[in-house]
Regions:
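Internal helix-loop-helix
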Residues: 9-79, 119-126, 137-138
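A short, Trp-centered hydrophobic/proline-enriched beta-strand micro-motif
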Residues: 78-86
Length: 190
């Protein structure tokens, strides 16, 4: 988390996020240069690319105004770390085959399932989580949610050992009837 402070002071954390949410409002070419220089120096540390260019971009592109206000300023300041939860033990990255379910219960959804090989999993505060809301619809049954990791029922598994990129954690994540409001849906259902 301390590295997020360093990158924020240098203007390199979520720099494509609009200024209205605390970002610099720059284009992706700036990020390409930043990440190219990180790679050139051999820095494989925390998953800044996932945090900045995947999670923040999902929220920026598909989030409601309330979701943007809730998460983007914290992500820019390094106060909230983002992660992308899609890969599952039996499905890999084949989203139409995922088993993590989100079942509607009144104004909420109840999420149960498991993810694996999730970068930033040990540190994340918010997860863009792929779930199945309709198991009969194949890929069209996949719905994304923003899951706050402080919610009851969320649990981090072990930090997985890897051959490389040891500075970036890769984790198992478990969701045991995690209740999220329908307003946590990112984009539309399916």
């Amino acid at each position: 988390r301390g590295l997020g402070d360093v990158y924020k002071r240098q203007g390199m954390l979520c720099c494509t996020v609009p200024e209205a949410y605390g970002g610099l409002g720059l284009d992706y070419l700036f990020d390409v240069v930043v990440f190219e220089e990180m790679a050139r120096s051999g820095f494989s540390g925390p998953g800044f690319l996932i945090h900045c260019d995947l999670v923040a971009t999902y929220i920026k592109s598909f989030g409601t105004e309330a979701q943007k206000q809730q998460w983007l300023p914290k992500m820019v300041r390094g106060e909230a770390i983002g992660s992308l939860g899609m890969t599952e033990p039996h499905a890999g990255s084949d989203l139409k085959a995922i088993r993590t379910r989100a079942v509607r219960d009144g104004d909420d959804f109840v999420i149960s399932g498991q993810k694996v090989f999730i970068s930033n999993g040990q540190l994340c505060d918010v997860i863009v989580l792929a779930t199945k809301t309709d198991s009969n619809a194949g890929a069209k049954g996949v719905t994304l949610f923003l899951v706050d990791t402080s919610l009851p029922g969320f649990r981090r598994g072990k930090n997985l050992k890897k051959l490389g990129m040891k500075g970036q954690d890769t984790s198992e994540l478990f969701f045991d009837e995690v209740r999220v409001p329908a307003s946590a849906m990112l984009g539309e259902e399916g």
